[in-house]
Amino acid sequence: MIDIKLLREHPELFRELVRIRNSDINVDELINIDQQLREQQQKTEALQSELNNLSRQKMIEEAKQVKEQLAQQEPVLKELQDKRKQILDRVPNFLAPDTPVGESDAQNLEVFRWGEQPKFDFTPKTHEELGKKLGILDIERGAKVSGSGFYYWVGDGARLQNAAFRYVEDLLTERGFVPFKTPVVTKSDALYATGYFPFSQDETYCINNSDMVLIGTSEQSLVPYRMNETIEESSLPLLYTAFTPCFRYEAGAAGRATRGIFRVHQFHKQEQIVLCKPEESEYWNLVCQKNVEDIMQGLEIPYRVVLVCTGDMGAPGFKKYDTEGWFAGFGEYRETHSNSNLIDYQARRANIKFNGKSKGFVHTISSTALTDRALIAIIENNQTKEGYVKIPKVLQKYMGGQTEIRPAQHKDVERVDVSYLKDRLNGLQYESIGDGNPETLAFFKK
């Protein structure tokens, strides 16, 4: 949400903003509605003041008339308030001065690369092929149970995922981030507060007959954690991280790297969230980016960083970096992380303020730390000629020292003594279904 006072004082800035953002917002219509609303508010305030100041003699004679006028004002005010809010809610955020101008991700500006793309003396397999061969990724049964866009991590696949997210959470907590286990269901207000509503409603799983939704990122549960609060300035910054399942419709994603599990309806994500003072948001945006790159380097995934252009940035974003990992199966860089400075856009919608030597709305940073996509890159980039997958060194300690994923072998499970558990019933006095009915007892014994 933007500052309405700024709109009144500098409408030309907003006309230019919606032009650059390719937004369909009519700034002049918004200004006109705002002016009408303010005039009607003044009229209502004058009537209320008149009602309050009526003498006893005139009260009986005139109060009824003034109250009728006030009653007539209510629907007028509400209609104008609703119209203004409907437009205001869709006004995009300002943009950082160094944001590239462009229409799509093709115009994003590459700013850095790290790592060498793996070279193979064989044709590399895709993560779907490797996952099926190794028995670590089951897309077919995911579709059987839940439909397309769902999947199972199995065996060492599940262990690899656990290892990767444990590694990332350990790294972030060592750097001062507080870990959370958040709800995965929130009120729709939480998505409005974070700027996902009204822009991304078609991407959201809404629960029937309720005001509840499934989160598409823990940003939607972590930022509203401080909704309608005023934070002591001395407590800032607040550094939060959470690992959650995430749910997205991915409407209109056909043809956009939908092969395998790159673009799905449910995935897992570790998020970085920062609430800070306005003058520090650029710094924390860069800190989150450093964390992203340290994670990618630790996982040995070659990557590039791009500065996102105007046409590829969501409405709440002020400045955004995307990090794209190399995927040997795709043969190209693909997005694995997004890292956005949202300045005060979310805080105004969520009403998160700070107070101290200075006061105002906090700034927020939202950055991916890890998603399942990184596992795809690990599987595709670290494959061997035999079809095995080498485990990155930083993850080996989380997998009991295992260095490689090979096809799962059936293992006989050692039988343990459980007779003492059955023996607990001996000597207990109670009525069972077989008491007094030999036929029933004989049937159940079979």
Predicted regions: what they are:
Residues 7, 33, 164, 387, ...:
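Conserved anionic group-binding/transfer micro-motifs
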Residues 429-435:
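Short acidic, glycine/serine/threonine-rich helix-capping segments at coil-helix boundaries
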Residues 1-118, 132, 136:
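N-terminal alpha-helical targeting/anchoring segments
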Residues 14, 54, 84, 168, ...:
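Hydrophobic alpha-helical packing residues
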Residues 112-427:
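TRNA-recognition modules of translation machinery and tRNA-sensing kinases, especially anticodon-binding
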Residues 40, 87, 171, 295-299, ...:
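Short alpha-helical functional segments enriched in proximate histidine and acidic residues
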Residues 435-446:
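Amphipathic terminal alpha-helices
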